[in-house]
């Protein structure tokens, strides 16, 4: 608990000319768990409409949005990994009359791309990685004049993670996923309105009553609309070993989503079950840290035979009570969200408690929860962490920006024994016992081949991304 990930994207195109704006807004609400800082939509012939805050607040702007109607458009939910959290960096981003773009991920080699962009556009705004890569795309499009071939060229220059939705001036919508498939992206259809949809997760399709078709394959661009009036797919990069983010399955994604053929809820239950089987602890009650750890706690309880109960509840009736701590842009905001988690003393007092959480990142959230459990009278506190120790930064779209901010690294730098790391983290947090899942257990729980998942934040293996070094700008 306590990390951020870059955003959710959405796109829609109706072959029947149906207004897709209501679906975009509902779709963004369905992706709210992926970002809480800002939201926005783009349709042909209108300025991008974007606001700070949560997507369901669109109702406060209903009068302004009433003029936004169109048969195609894109939307975005933002949490910042690069660039400051302000309206200027909110997305979608419009580039003249050519296109608007929404991005989930992080582009690593922005410095190299920036030099190329600035060579012909010295005044270009390159304040975020999305703006840099979009400027470069614009340059290539002027030479290629074909979206499919443009991405074939762009892919050879860009290093990083990207799932894009793009709206061009012709009203076509494109869904693009990087060759490794770091971030999720899928397409679906709303049959009644003839609307094809692209979204970060299938839960957004459910939100607009659309049917899932398939994932966008890594290295694939799909055009919604266009001359074929359905969808058209093109592979812009050769097939390489995928590197799907393993953290999506334990924390980021919505439990109802199916990503790369795996139901997230089942993966989380499995990871709890496997953790209980491999790391047995004695306790009287299993308590999840709300909300993402609930399925894992159920799995842990089922496997261990220790009853599960709700000992921590989010106060959803106070400011920020229902929000996610990991994707708050500032530490103070993260702590405020966690302090809205209220212990239920009757469940906790006098008991040996096993707390199941999805991860330990910076450790500040865990410290607050542990203190709350102590104050509620827990006899002992043991922790089961479903994601292995996070020891390295992420350059593919998650806010693990520097080793020094990672608790496991701070207390166990250089250590490779997962049990020793767990013991040192337990001591730092003031708990009686703490056990992590390991990479093999996590891969087994997810149900995908181990070599198709990214574990770089755990083992520091960035070979699929390329040679990388820590970069200060990733703290932005």
PLM regions: where:
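Flexible loop/turn segments at secondary-structure boundaries
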Residues: 81-82, 109, 173, 182-183, ...
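A conserved beta-strand->alpha-helix junction
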Residues: 126, 131-134, 308-323, 427-446
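Hydrophobic alpha-helical segments characteristic of transmembrane helices
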Residues: 256-257, 282-310
